[in-house]
């Protein structure tokens, strides 16, 4: 019968006729039940057939047997007792109250034998609810449409006459069942009423529990709850016509009806009271005015009685919003919504629909487990407990009956939404996961609840607003935020569906639970996985085959919280890819995305850098969803950049506690960010005021930079331009910068890649700006760290470690630093120098009374490091016997190569010398050995005995047998410890007091001392000019070197002392230029035949670059200015005549000479100008006091555009100029200082072509000084062709077919005859500034007008011309590009120059050659390659005669040299 009725309902949808038939049968039989369960003798008037459907024993009641009996009684008039419930009926009775439960195929089970539903085709209709809910099973297997009704069912339903197989009296129902009486509306639908279909209330879920409701314990199926039948209505109620009349119940009064326009489409609710039990807080699904108070017993410990009414609704043709297609006259019949079940979804799919669950009265609404902000873990635990308890059954119990309906789009009832009804005061709270009560206890509970009085009627509330229903159970949320602790679970506290690991050989792809085949064996994937493992940040393309996505997720989160606001979003949308990443991205598009549908196909990630969202769901980590949210916003086209930035900032703030969980309790939470600290550094430099910077303050800045770099490693560093000039920095600026760096060091942990890059850039900016203040060396700052002193002592050899540690402990503590700065030592300790002690036997030092602990025995502290990495010893120990004129050795056995003293090496200084007997002192002190020593030891040394003997060094002076022997020993060992009162004419370093421009020497260098008589004996030689000999006494290292070569002033020593002959009198020195030559570059040495030539270095300049700057010319590998092309020493006489002294770091007495000049001129109240071009400052270099003028510049061959951009032809003659590079701007500073210090002297001319002359090989001879003046050129060339009548030979000898200029110098006959052979073309200098030179990346960075000017300009040689410096913004003042004009030929305007193997023809602007009408005069035309004439043969023009003689009045008749053209 039930099957027939279901078929009838599905096919015809005439639910109202069924109700009418049931009402007619009820009128005949008088079916009604009282509160006590007995049958009513008389049926109340106005009740409808819904009592037979939803009342006790009705079709949709709890018991299937009673339901079927009631329907049969209504249709056929037969009466029979109900059958006991089957297992399936009991299972469906636990499905939850008042629900429409859509079952999947796997929910169906075999019914027990004898069950009415067993084997019945109508088992799709289950009566398994506590309070009469509708349970729909799977559709027919044959098709998706409903099954046709049977004729018997149709007839029985329409006529309402007897026709069923037996009738059962309603009085035979269980006596425990109860029904609350209700009074119907004014009219009940009869058989003639219009057909209506039953549907739940549109828009509002029925029976939804409140946010604080606890899981209810279902009542046993044998004790069905009372159901109040709602009267049927045809249409919506009007304000004048209420939806229903008052409803009465035993023990309670009628509730007033709440009218309104919405009528039956809304439910009336009120807010729950805190003193009401949870059993009474039920959603009343009845229409307005059709409710009755809930009958509950406040004395009962658990109550499960709930009133539920499902009303029939007449809807229009539109589809119901819940997507089930229930309403509407023309709508589709009731069907289950097809859906795919996921893993872990068992409890979720059973709680769908309209539910009104019950729970024990002991459940407290104030329990934190069900509070709006509490997690749902107790619900999940209760569900798991009930599933384990009912393992014999295939479906779990309704532990999730408290889940929200499908109409809720957020968790829980929204703020302002009506809540469940309130009841009596709450009972004591119960445990969160209480066991399910038995059937007997539930029955007793139901009975006691039914007999309890109902509360007072509730007032009417405004109708509840509609909400759009969804079909996704995951949208069931609760009020308030989700749990903030623990894993992120579903709203029901279960794992996310589809988060299980994919099957073997597959990876996540697509929707939840979907996967694809893995591609681990592809080469592209393996390479991408290797890059992913090695990457420090996020990779631009990620797929699951590359490895664990945790690293990528965390890197993306760091990226979002780093850098500017829009950088992360831009990178996520369009990640910057290198070539391998681009190839891998194409591979993924071809092999991963293309086989899986179109562009809108669900992939689980938005952009290539994002891993699949299933990894975040499986990890249950909400922080991993942040990159997906940011990427989704970035890909949206509905926001502009500012709006996206706002959303990103909102997400960053919302996720901040998860991304940085310890920041709230971190005391540094309020400190500035990395970006703000970097801006603070830049602002400090921008606001710098000039002032004298103490050296310890600069060292503190260096230490702060080192601290930041220590936190950043590894980090990509870029070399920026200095922010300010050294003279513009003041102490306040450095204090602010150092404090910002210290704060930046502490802010580095936790910073993202972009922030780390900003910090690295800031450190590089500070380093390049402060580097001139520390003389481009960190040794002084490192020596100020106290920890290094102790570390050097601890790591020293055992025989000196104790003494060094004691000395370190005895040193004074660090000085009080400035506020916010690290502590600094009062002086640079360098290597700890223990106190002098009596030397022991066998000590290798040659100093009297010195041992391993003597200051002079520490060669690292008393050596001078040159640019090539070699060092000169400070003491003349142990090497004097190797000298050819050393005389007899009192200890022959000491000629054997001695071992170095333990601990004599300075930590971190690299390879050391072997004393003065090593290569550094056997040669020129720079690693160049003497020629005579390269042949090995002398024969005389071999004849001496080599037997072992104790070292008599400590007693050489005191125990010598003769005075001559004692004198020789003193000359061989000139240095000793510094006495308390050194003699004024002794040999020692004289460092001025106060601040210095350059680093101060180490303590060991300052402790070396040579007695005056020994010093005079050593410097009294012809190789040293007399006026310069005092300069050597300022350098103990030079005295030690002279002592090692005493009596043998060979070529190396003479070469190193040749600088003394540049200017005869030190009083005439005005400017000292310090430079560091490249290997094999010599200023005062003749290049030997077969000697190694210097190697060209485009990144480092040496002597060649310096002289080219002074000579106002270019220096390229094929030019005369390059030292590799020299055949003799260059001539710098014009510079020396102006008082300019060039001093190399390799020269003998380099440090002493500078300090001597500073001391001598400073004592005369004269200031010395020091131009420093040394990049690698040598150890123990000269200390220049701040009294003198100090100018710092570097030599950079790449400043020449021909070297910087060799492919750019138009800028071959251009040179980039800046005050930080040796050139016109730097020379202008020196010249201005000179004019200020010497106003009456001749002004300096540091950038002129006659300052330097080179000796090179030309056609005039192998050693030709260039530029060779025109007269000297003719004197050398013309005699070779005198009397020669062979014109071809004359042409070849004079170079008539050669270009005018080659490699920028005059080469052809007519150019050499006019300007001199080798006269260079002048370059064009382009002023860029300090910052502009560093930021200039290519020739495109220069204005096009400037490039055109440089291409057309041709500056003819001029020995007295000043440099032409152009500013990119001041080209208008430069006028037309200069050009060469031949004054002897009216039509000869072009200049032929060779460069790069090609010959180019340059014509001045506006000039035209013969027959060149309309040709671009500024064009550069390549007419041929070198080797031939190369000139195009035009029409024969008039014969031109060139006067070779200087005599302008000479007659051409006697001149045999006529040039034909």
Curated annotation (Swiss-Prot):
Residues 250-260 have a biased composition (Gly residues). Residues 102-113 have a biased composition (Acidic residues). The keyword DNA damage does not apply. One of its GO terms (molecular function) is DNA binding. Residues 270-285 have a biased composition (Basic and acidic residues). A long stretch of serine residues may be a major site of phosphorylation. Keywords: DNA-binding, Early protein, Host nucleus, Phosphoprotein, Transcription, Transcription regulation. Residues 25-60, 75-518, 811-1002, 1395-1461 are annotated as: Disordered. It is found in: Host nucleus. One of its GO terms (cellular component) is host cell nucleus. GO terms for biological process: DNA-templated viral transcription; positive regulation of DNA-templated transcription. This IE protein is a multifunctional protein capable of migrating to the nucleus, binding to DNA, trans-activating other viral genes, and autoregulating its own synthesis. Belongs to the herpesviridae ICP4 family. This is Major viral transcription factor ICP4 homolog. It comes from Suid herpesvirus 1 (strain Indiana-Funkhauser / Becker). The gene is IE.
